[in-house]
Amino acid sequence: MEKSTQSKSKYSIILGVAFVWFTTHFGGGFASGAQIYSYYVRYGVWCLITPAIAMIYNAVFFAYCLYFARKHEVYDYRSYNNALYGRFAPVFSNLFEVLYICVMCVAPAVAFATGGATLSTLTGLPYLVCTLVIGVFIFIVAIFGTDLVRRVASVLSICIIVGLLIVYIPNIIASSHEISQTASTMNSDAFPLGKALYSAFLYGTFQLANVAVFVQHARSFDKPKDAVKSMGIGCVINIIMMTVVVLGIMTVASNPDMAKQSVPTLFMVQSGVGSRFLTPLISVLIILGAVSTAV
């Protein structure tokens, strides 16, 4: 009985950390479809495979970092960098410190702005009040440490995944013919593979800065090898959800007005099925995406 309980706890931690990766990756740009369109769909039919390449690239990097952190018991990014870079730590640890400060300024700012604006649109409350609500929620979750962050990440991930599937699957099914036509058009246009791979590389590399917030979760692993399992699961989750978003955006990618859209997902919903119900749901997902990234 005790072994069974320990096994369940072990796998819940592995899954929880995988969800931390997903919620960190899933921000307002992901929810709105803007990032997926800019980095993938714009580069033609290669968008069906390049998200997987980017996430595998991330998974290898994150798995090694978490494995290293657990093996050497370094659970804050400064100690981790010092151990990783060795005699080069005085240079690279300090460079990473500057990078991390920049990221920590930008990520919450984007969360406050995106979440506050969307919440204001949904509720009609003043923007500043909505921004304050978002900020208080993020602050409360953050001050209670990594255990609460991991639990919140798991709950948010389930809500986000279910929400994305509700939004995208009906539109993908209803517009499967448009997806086929778009893929054929993309294929005939012969977009260069090199540019598509480079864009995916840029997207994946930008995500690597998240390692600073990941290493603290390595403490919860029973063994260093659990990091590999966790990031493997996270990789599969991210690939599936990114592919779903790609297919959804492909339903409207051939529309001449698509290039003007700042929120491709909203344009997809308004052009597809169930817009009355799905439009507010997309707004909620954008808020959850902004909050999950900041947390």
What are these regions (language model features)?
Residues 2-6, 33-38, 144-155, 212-237, ...:
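Hydrophobic, small-residue-rich membrane helices and short re-entrant helix-turn-helix hairpins
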Residues 3-13, 42-48, 71-103, 121-127, ...:
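Transmembrane-helix boundary/entry motifs in multi-pass membrane transporters
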Residues 8-12, 39-66, 235-239, 243:
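Extracellular loop-to-transmembrane helix junctions
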Residues 11-31, 50, 103-104, 171-176, ...:
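Hydrophobic, membrane-embedded alpha-helices of multi-pass small-molecule transporters
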Residues 21, 52-78, 248-255:
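Juxtamembrane transmembrane-helix boundary signature
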Residues 28, 101, 138, 142, ...:
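Hydrophobic alpha-helical segments and their helix-loop junctions in multi-pass secondary transporters
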Residues 62-67, 174-180, 199-202, 218, ...:
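Extracellular/periplasmic helix-exit of transmembrane alpha-helices
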Residues 110, 114-117, 126-134, 141-172:
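Membrane-interface loop-to-helix entry segments
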